[in-house]
Amino acid sequence: MILKLRIQLLLELLIMINQVYQLVSPRQFEATFKTIDLHNHNSKVIVRPLYLSICAADLRYYCGNRDSKILSKKLPMSLIHESVGEIVYDSEHRLKNGTKVVMIPNTPSKSHNIIAENYLTSSHFKSSGYDGFMQDYIVMKPDRVVTLPQEIDLSVASYTELVTVSVHAIDRFKAKAIPQFESLGIWGDGNLGYITAVLLKKLYPTTKIIVFGKTLYKLSRFSFVDEIIQIDNIPQHIKIDHAFECVGGKGSQQAIEQIINIINPEGSIALLGVSELPIQVNTRMVLEKGLTIIGSSRSGLKDFEKTIELYRKYPEVLNQLALLKGKEFEINTIEDLITAFEYDISNAWGKTVLKWNI
């Protein structure tokens, strides 16, 4: 109640003091203060974050596992681009205070009638050179938030952004792949592989879904797919029509090599995994088989809207996504933030969630 009165008083003064929690160097957070000016006439909403989720990209920054030139250019910076919150101000009075929303980290400054917003070089992305959601309040354009279903578990919804990445990749795959869907292979037994498997099993119910992974205890979580296979023991008879690579890192080279070897002619390979270093690809076999390689990165408004519609249409998808939730941390201090990030470094599977009380 006191917090709401404080917010209302600040809004009446048409200025807000916002505390932003930035990574200033590897493993070191500091709080800084910035003002939010409500005098200007630009349409905006202000969101109070409620739950956030740590992503692999956040960990790379936190641990300093990026090129030193990139770190010096982008830091200090607030981390995290996966978050849900509640509206505390809407300049157009379209959304009521307290409305629960998911926030879209991609911020386009221009539009294009062909190229998607997440591929425009003019777009900005939160927690990648621009402050992320580790703030007291987030100022956004009205089209950068999507209203959530009323009964949704906000802690599970916190990693909706990662779900939209998979939704976006599947849409691109649909638009470019030949219409042969007897079998689909997914490489990767981590968070993104799990989400992609959940979605493909729902969107292609009659297609055989096979997940290829390295670790048996992770693969055991994919009990809803048709078959799981360890990458060190792939049967010679296995063939797939199309593939989704969700491995990333050094392992993406082996994954792509295996895909090329067992995929049927004219199949499509959707690449979702991120590798910091260049990898080798057997282009001879890509040409010989007539394969299509589809790159996907991030997501935009349409992908968020489609994902929320999937939540409403298939509530069982949310139940499966809930199994991805790992440990939840209550964040009241910067020390709590450090504890959560340190935990996530050694977290082998699942999404670490932050309840944002700070």
Language model: regions and residue ranges:
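N-terminal amphipathic/basic-hydrophobic helices that include classical n-h-c signal peptides
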Residues: 1-15
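Mid-domain Rossmann-like dinucleotide-binding core that forms the NAD(H)/NADP(H) cofactor-binding site
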Residues: 5, 152-232
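C-terminal hydrophobic helical "lid"/dimerization subdomain
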Residues: 15-18, 301-358
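Glycine-rich beta-strand-centered segment in the early N-terminal region that forms part
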Residues: 37-52, 67-110, 149-151
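Residue-level marker of beta-strand positions
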Residues: 82-84, 99-100, 137, 189, ...
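Receiver (REC) domain switch-region micro-motif
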Residues: 101, 184, 243
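NAD(P)H dinucleotide-binding glycine-rich loop of Rossmann-like/cofactor-binding domains
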Residues: 107-183
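Glycine-rich cofactor phosphate-binding loops and adjacent beta1-alpha1 units
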Residues: 176-180, 203-204, 219-291
